């Protein structure tokens, strides 16, 4: 770690953001990412001959006693500090981020002895940031980097950092700043999201041991800043290894781990309201345009259906989005034009050595997937000057950029079908030749694939093309209707749409069933699962870049988060869907299915025999590696609930064990889970807080009553200048207007002091989230009283905000606020 006086590991999230703002760096992201970014900035300041910010210059002074405080102590101090309102808010947020003890258990399992105290706290805090952050869950980056650096930090057993002589703080050699930073070739500036190469655990440990030997042999010149003399080097190095331990890196967490974490959010969320119906648009079906049915859910198409872009908010910036035109052709000489109108900025991603903007344009069959160039009979020309088909790439033509126009030609009249391109009117030659026998008369459809870019099409609707085309070619819109082939159409009514929810433990065989069922019904279903999200992230070239920078784990972490938003979008589309997730808890089943009101809602339960399940999980672990901790599987077994037809399903199918046999097996699983796992922590209802002179939030009125805030015998009997009644008592502060509100009765139990009227109350008859705070206009609606202050921090707001799809911030990506109507998504 750095020798800077700012101990990054001891800072809270608010302090990390403050330090980053002072250095004009972004303060968005998870706690571990903020730590990494700040540490990199401090290292660069030292390497550049500029001392890190001193405490006297505005930096936080964490030396002395404050450096020795544990993370739990800091949280307690934060909860106790500030005024009374901030105290209650922090207590509420601690209750929200509890995660039923799951994050704590995961941290204890994955941490080493030296990091056992800090790991669970940080993972819980990171989960709280992700759910209740200021940016509504808009948090990008990888927290695994912060965990690894923390596990490798120079700490003793109590989390204290050894004091270092100021004179040695400027002597850290550049080669000791970390092999990861050298591999990225970075000499100055903040660390980017993808710029650090993560070494395997064995290599990391070997580097630490080799570094220890060099320090011991090389004396003070090459040693760690603040280290003892050369004679004590070996002793301290050995002691440091024992105290520090080896923390399990986050790369060991596979896809199942992040699915498990995301699934847990449903157990603490409120049931969402059904989404707003999609507007029925009357559109001329004979016009060639972008097809709103044959496109990705996150492919945002304009009202006129002639321009589009990929969604770039939150983790969607990692995804590629594609779409096809509504008509294809199989004869003649046909063309269309595509213009790159914008490379959409994605400032919430800190990227380097990664291409985050890309466009592929070309042709494909209607049976091909949306990832242009990744399958057979899918032909694309890339913005990078590369042609792609069936994942095979080859240099072609030249690169193109914003405001360039690409004309795509298809010649079906030659001996072989020829696909060629032109850039800004300049012919680039033939890119692909397809055998007519192999193509077998099947039509080719215009197809585009975008990655954080916006495009515009001319299928022939413009009076004048962007650039002149050869006389023998015709725009596809001008081809006679009988010579065009219409792409597949979706259901016309929502009652004709079908949603199938898979239910089963990880590795039970759900994806196998989905693959088989989709193959039996080609083109019918859109599969919503982590695998499909990963496919849209890991397009061949992008996957290689991510692998080179060691950030594939970032995609695994973001995929389940994107999937939740995909489900919300899907509920507004008239399509058929399969939800390929575990969905074992009744809460997850109910909250997802209530979004699809009006659909034919079906459940498919995959529950094999216990012996078969063990064999399948063992086989999966051998092939893919174990990606889910054992205790997480046990908890899912304990939460496994079979669906009921009367609740939210119209039809339930049991693939292997039938309902009676499956129910017996689940009872066995629940007993196994109960014996193996510790008792779950009860959710904080506020009743225990009363013994500590704390307010009973969400139980009684804020202005008084038995446990009211500031009421009799609360907060040490502090009556704050008034009679021994509640906070809104009669003669409080010299007959000033009463602050408390509520119904009838006395201000405090047993005291005959009248209360204030209901409507001017600061928090009326019920809790803080009820009715009003300072008058009838609501700060929080009447029913939003579950997690305090009326903000409804449940599933359908803030980080999981359903309403954000209907509000302005979703459409704040200029210039799309002028081109797209808000009701579309």
From Swiss-Prot:
Modified residues (N-acetylserine): 2
Acidic residues bias locations: 82-95, 120-134, 140-153
Chain intervals for the UniProt region annotation (Actin-binding): 611-626
Matches recorded under InterPro entries: B30.2/SPRY, B30.2/SPRY_sf, ConA-like_dom_sf, P-loop_NTPase, SAP_dom, SAP_dom_sf, SPRY_dom, SPRY_hnRNP_U
Matches recorded under SMART domains: SAP, SPRY
UniProt biased composition (Basic and acidic residues): 233-266, 671-683
The record's account of how the chain is modified after translation: Cleaved at Asp-100 by CASP3 during T-cell apoptosis, resulting in a loss of DNA- and chromatin-binding activities. Extensively phosphorylated. Phosphorylated on Ser-59 by PLK1 and dephosphorylated by protein phosphatase 2A (PP2A) in mitosis.
Site (Cleavage): 100-101
Cross-link for Glycyl lysine isopeptide (Lys-Gly) (interchain with G-Cter in SUMO2), residue positions: 265, 495, 516, 524, 536, 565, 574, 609, 626, 635, 664, 670, 814
PANTHER family associated with the record: HETEROGENEOUS NUCLEAR RIBONUCLEOPROTEIN U, HETEROGENEOUS NUCLEAR RIBONUCLEOPROTEIN U FAMILY MEMBER
Function: DNA- and RNA-binding protein involved in several cellular processes such as nuclear chromatin organization, telomere-length regulation, transcription, mRNA alternative splicing and stability, Xist-mediated transcriptional silencing and mitotic cell progression. Plays a role in the regulation of interphase large-scale gene-rich chromatin organization through chromatin-associated RNAs (caRNAs) in a transcription-dependent manner, and thereby maintains genomic stability.
Name this polypeptide is given: Heterogeneous nuclear ribonucleoprotein U
């Amino acid at each position: 770690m750095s020798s800077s006086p700012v101990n990054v590991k001891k800072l809270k999230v608010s302090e990390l953001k403050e330090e980053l703002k002072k250095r004009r760096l972004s303060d968005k992201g998870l706690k571990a990412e903020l730590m990494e970014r700040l540490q990199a900035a401090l290292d660069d300041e030292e390497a550049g001959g500029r001392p890190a910010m001193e405490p006297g210059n505005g930096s936080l002074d964490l030396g002395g006693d404050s450096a020795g405080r544990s993370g739990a102590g800091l949280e307690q101090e934060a909860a106790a500090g500030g005024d009374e309102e901030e105290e209650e808010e922090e207590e509420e947020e601690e209750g929200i981020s509890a995660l039923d003890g799951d994050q704590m258990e995961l941290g204890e399992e994955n941490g080493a002895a030296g990091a056992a105290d800090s790991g669970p706290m940080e993972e819980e805090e990171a989960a709280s940031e992700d759910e209740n952050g200021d940016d509504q869950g808009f948090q990008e980056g990888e927290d695994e980097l912060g965990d690894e650096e923390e596990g490798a930090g120079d700490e003793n057993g109590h989390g204290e950092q050894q004091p270092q002589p100021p004179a040695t703080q400027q002597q850290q050699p550049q080669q000791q700043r970390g092999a990861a930073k050298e591999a990225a070739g970075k000499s100055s500036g903040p660390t980017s999201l993808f710029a650090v190469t993560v070494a395997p655990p064995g290599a990391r440990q070997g580097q630490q041991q080799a570094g220890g030997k060099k320090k011991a042999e090389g004396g003070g010149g090459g040693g760690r800043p603040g280290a003892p003399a050369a004679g004590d080097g070996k002793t301290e190095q050995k002691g440091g290894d024992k105290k520090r331990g080896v923390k399990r890196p986050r790369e060991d967490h596979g896809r199942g781990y992040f699915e498990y974490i995301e699934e847990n959010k449903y157990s603490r969320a409120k049931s969402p309201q059904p989404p707003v119906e999609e507007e029925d648009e009357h559109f001329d079906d004979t016009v060639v345009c972008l097809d709103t049915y044959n496109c990705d859910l996150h492919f945002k198409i304009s009202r006129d259906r002639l321009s589009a872009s990929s969604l770039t908010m939150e983790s969607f910036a990692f995804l590629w989005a594609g779409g096809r035109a509504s008509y294809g052709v199989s004869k003649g000489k046909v063309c269309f034009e595509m213009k790159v109108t914008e490379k959409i900025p994605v400032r919430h991603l800190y990227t380097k050595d990664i291409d985050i903007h890309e466009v592929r344009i070309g042709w494909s069959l209607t049976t091909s997937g949306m990832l242009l160039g990744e399958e057979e009979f899918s032909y694309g020309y890339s913005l990078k000057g590369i042609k792609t088909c069936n994942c095979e790439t080859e240099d072609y033509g030249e690169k193109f950029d914003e405001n360039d126009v690409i004309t795509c030609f298809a010649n079906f009249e030659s001996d072989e079908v020829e696909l060629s391109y032109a850039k800004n009117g300049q012919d680039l030659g033939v890119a692909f030749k397809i055998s007519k026998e192999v193509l077998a008369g099947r039509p080719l459809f215009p197809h585009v694939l975008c990655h954080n870019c916006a495009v515009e099409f001319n299928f022939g609707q413009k009076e004048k093309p962007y650039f002149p085309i050869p006389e023998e070619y015709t725009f596809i819109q001008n081809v006679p209707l009988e010579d065009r082939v219409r792409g597949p159409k979706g259901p016309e009514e929502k009652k004709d749409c079908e949603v199938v929810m898979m239910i089963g433990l990880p590795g039970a065989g759900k994806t196998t069933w989905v693959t088989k069922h989709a193959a039996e019904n080609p083109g019918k279903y859109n599969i919503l699962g982590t695998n499909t999200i990963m496919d849209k992230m890991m397009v061949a070239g992008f996957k290689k870049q991510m692998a080179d920078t060691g950030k594939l784990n970032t995609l695994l972490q973001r995929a389940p988060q994107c999937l939740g938003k995909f489900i919300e979008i899907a509920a507004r589309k008239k399509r058929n869907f399969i939800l390929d997730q575990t969905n074992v808890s009744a809460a997850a089943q109910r909250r997802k299915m209530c979004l699809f009101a009006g659909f034919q809602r079906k459940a498919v339960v995959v529950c094999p025999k216990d012996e078969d399940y063990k064999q399948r999980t063992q086989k999966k672990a051998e092939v893919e590696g174990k990606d889910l901790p054992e205790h997480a599987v046990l908890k899912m077994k304990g939460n496994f609930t079979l669906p009921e037809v009367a609740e939210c399903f119209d039809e339930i199918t049991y693939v292997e064990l039938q309902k009676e046999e499956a129910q017996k097996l689940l009872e066995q699983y629940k007993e196994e889970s109960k014996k193996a796992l510790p008792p779950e922590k009860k959710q904080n209802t506020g009743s225990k807080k009363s013994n500590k002179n704390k307010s009973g939030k969400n139980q009684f009125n804020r202005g008084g009553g038995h446990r009211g805030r500031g009421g009799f015998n609360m907060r040490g009997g502090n009556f704050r200048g008034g009679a021994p009644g509640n906070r809104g008592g009669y003669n409080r502060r010299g007959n000033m207007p009463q602050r408390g509100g509520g119904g009838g009765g006395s201000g405090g139990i047993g005291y005959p002091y009248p209360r204030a009227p209901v409507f001017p109350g600061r928090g009326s008859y019920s809790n803080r989230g009820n009715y009003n705070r300072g008058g009838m206009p609501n700060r929080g609606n009447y029913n939003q009283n579950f997690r305090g202050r009326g903000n409804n921090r449940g599933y359908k707001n803030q980080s999981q905000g359903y309403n954000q799809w209907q509000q302005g911030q979703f459409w704040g990506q200029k210039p799309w606020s002028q081109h797209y109507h808000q009701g579309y998504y």
